[in-house]
Amino acid sequence: MSIISPQDVKKLREETNAGFGDCKKALSVAGGDFELAKKKLREMGIASAEKRLDRDAKEGRVFSYSNNIYAGLLLVSCETDFVALNHNFVNFGNSLIKELVESGIDSLTTSQELELKNLAATIKENIQVKKIFITKIQSNEFVKIYLHGEQSKIGVLVKLKVNDFSKTEDKIFKNFAMDLALHVAAFAPVYLRNDDVCPNYIKEQEEIFTKQLESSGKPESIIKGIVAGKIKKHLAEISLLEQSFVKNDKITVKEMLEEISKAISSKVEMVEFKYLRIG
């Protein structure tokens, strides 16, 4: 039986980031063979990682990347905010979103899934890739990405179409793009425009509002008018273009787009947005 020295255990820990006890056990099982010990650690870690999948993973962070061909956001969850700051966790997320964007694919490969399991095994938490968003950037489209706070618990991507793309260098446009991303982070719209809202959802809301007013004693025609007003207000809360703009609540985002178009002498249109949030 080979003797496992503290130096051997230390070396294996430095190479794998696994715990002292796990490294010692792996070296013992492997008879002191470092490569075999690494394999044993991976096997041990993946098995224990599978057991953690039922544990809550309510922390984490959002990662982003853009290469001017594709842009994307990635939400990776973990169990504690401490791990969300762990350099192995952060490096994994940054590396993964870069790989996904450069490939233009919004799903994990087998090797990426294995990397995820190995990370969970090393850190000993339930770590999951919750959401992946990848979008292709056309020649006349501008993408702005915003990550909120040190832990990046909110991630926003907005895509704008600009007829004269040279105008995207204008300071007015750049400030607006940033403000728009901040707006999405602050107000968390669900849809881009009213037309995107599912008709069944609107019908359900109408029924709810009508039910709430049944005991009011008001005539049916009045109730219909009130319900229509409530629906309009609700849509303005969940549709980005209808929301009051974060920097000027007297106008909507749609109206602000028109003002920016005039200010830079080029039509600016909202193409899409994505909002991701931890928790």
UniProtKB/Swiss-Prot annotation:
Q: Cross-referenced InterPro entries, in alphabetical order?
A: EF-Ts_dimer_sf, Transl_elong_EFTs/EF1B, Transl_elong_EFTs/EF1B_dimer, Transl_elong_Ts_CS, UBA-like_sf
A Pfam family that this protein carries is EF_TS
Query: GO molecular function: any one?
Result: translation elongation factor activity
| Key words, A-Z | Cytoplasm, Elongation factor, Protein biosynthesis
Q: Does the keyword Protein biosynthesis apply?
A: yes
Q: Which GO terms describe its cellular component?
A: cytosol
In residue numbers, the region (Involved in Mg(2+) ion dislocation from EF-Tu) covers: 80-83
Its main subcellular localisation, reduced to a broad class, is cytoplasm
Per UniProt, subcellular location reads as:
Cytoplasm
Family, according to the entry, reads as follows:
Belongs to the EF-Ts family.
Known role: Associates with the EF-Tu.GDP complex and induces the exchange of GDP to GTP. It remains bound to the aminoacyl-tRNA.EF-Tu.GTP complex up to the GTP hydrolysis stage on the ribosome.
Q: This chain belongs to which protein, by name?
A: Elongation factor Ts
Species of origin reads Borreliella burgdorferi (strain ATCC 35210 / DSM 4680 / CIP 102532 / B31) (Borrelia burgdorferi)
